[in-house]
Amino acid sequence: MTLSSEDREAWLARWREGRTHFHLDQVHPTLMRYIDQTPLGGRILVPLCGKSLDLGWLNDQGYEVVGVELSEQAVSELFEQLEVEPIRTRDGPFEIWQSPGLSVYVGDIFELTANSVGTFDTIWDRAALIALNPTDRARYAPHVSSFLKKDSTVLLSVLVLSLIHI
C-alpha cells in the first residue's frame, strides 16, 4: 500500500510553495548528541529526509547514508547545498541520486523494499513519523523496521504535546 494521491500532492505542494518550516538550517542537535550510540561507519536510513543537512553530516562522519524522499525538489536542493553533482539512476519506481557514501531514493517510502536498499544498522527518524498522515503511522513503524539488521538502533526525535481540554 502506498501513500494516497492526496497525501502525495499535499507533500509536493508544501515543497513547491516553500512551506517547509520544519527544515532546520543546521544539523539536528539530537542527532549530534546520540550518534555515538550507533556503529561508526554503519549504514543509516533517513526516511522522509527532505533536504536535511543531517545526511551530509552523517556522510562526513563516515557513515553510509541512504535517504528516502518523495519530493524531487527537496533532493535537488539537498545536493545543491552539499555542492555535489549526483549520479542519477533508476530502480523500479525510484530515481536514485548518488554521491560517494550517500544515496537518496526519490519516491514513496512505502514502495521501498529491503531487496532494493538492503538493511541498516541505524534509522534516523527526525520527523518522518510526525510528518505522515496519522492513518499511515501504524504501518510506517513495521515497514521501516523491516530494513533493520539484528541488534540495530533507531534514533527517533519526537514531539511531546500536552493536550488541554477546555
Task: Indicate where each model-derived feature is located.
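Conserved small/polar residues in nucleotide/adenosyl-binding loops
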Residues: 165-166
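Conserved SAM/SAH-binding beta-strand->alpha-helix loop
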Residues: 71-72
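A short glycine-rich, Lys/Arg-flanked "PGG" loop and its adjoining helix->strand segment in the class I
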Residues: 138-150
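S-adenosyl-L-methionine
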Residues: 1-40, 82-112
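Conserved class I S-adenosyl-L-methionine
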Residues: 41-50
